[in-house]
C-alpha cells in the first residue's frame, strides 16, 4: 500500500496533521507532495500512524516554498529509505536535528540526496550522520547545503558521489 504522487504538482498549501491517520497499512510514500510549490510547512505528526512505512522517497522534493518541518517527522517509524526526501527544497530552514531529533535512526540505510539543494537548511550534518549509523547509500545527501554549520567538514561522499 502506497501513497505515490498523490498530491504531486498540486496547489496544496497546508497539510492536516491527521491526513494519513486512517491508513496504518501504508508501507511507502513516494513523490507524495513532490512539486507542491505553495507548501510552506509540514506538521510533525503527519506520519505518526504510518507504523509500517519503510520508504519515504521524493516525498517533498521540489517543494520550493517549504520552510519548516515539524519536530521528529519520522520518529518511531521503521523507515529504511529516505532518499530525495527534501531534494530541492531551497527555502527549508529547519535545523536538521529538529527534523531528526532522536539519538538514533538505526533502521535508515539510504539517505541519497535527502537534503540535496537545501541551501538554507541549518544545523550540523555530522550530527545527522551520527544518528544514521547503518547508512550504506548517502551520495549527495548534503549537496549544496551550505548553511549547515559544518558544511566544509562533511565527507565528500555525503556531498557528491566522490570519496
PLM feature spans:
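Solvent-exposed loop and capping/linker segments of extracellular ligand-binding repeat ectodomains
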Residues: 1-163
Amino acid at each position: 500500500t502506497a501513497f505515490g504522487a498523490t498530491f504531486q504538482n498540486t496547489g496544496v498549501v497546508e497539510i492536516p496533521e491527521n491526513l494519513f491517520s486512517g491508513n496504518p497499512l501504508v508501507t511507502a510514500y513516494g513523490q507524495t507532495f513532490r512539486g507542491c510549490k505553495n507548501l510552506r510547512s509540514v506538521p510533525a505528526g503527519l506520519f505518526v500512524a504510518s507504523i509500517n512505512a519503510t520508504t519515504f522517497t521524493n516525498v517533498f522534493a521540489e517543494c520550493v516554498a517549504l520552510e519548516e518541518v515539524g519536530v521528529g517527522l519520522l520518529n518511531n517509524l521503521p523507515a529504511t529509505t529516505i532518499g530525495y526526501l527534501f531534494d530541492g527544497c531551497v527555502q527549508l530552514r529547519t535545523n536538521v536535528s529538529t527534523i531528526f531529533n532522536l539519538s538514533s535512526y538505526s533502521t535508515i540505510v539510504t539517505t541519497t540526496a535527502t537534503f540535496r539543494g537545501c541551501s538554507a537548511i541549518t544545523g550540523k550534518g555530522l550530527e545527522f550522520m551520527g544518528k544514521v549509523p547503518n547508512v550504506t547509500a548517502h551520495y549527495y545527501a548534503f549537496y549544496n547545503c551550505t548553511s549547515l554549520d559544518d558544511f566544509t567538514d562533511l565527507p565528500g561522499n555525503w556531498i557528491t558521489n566522490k570519496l
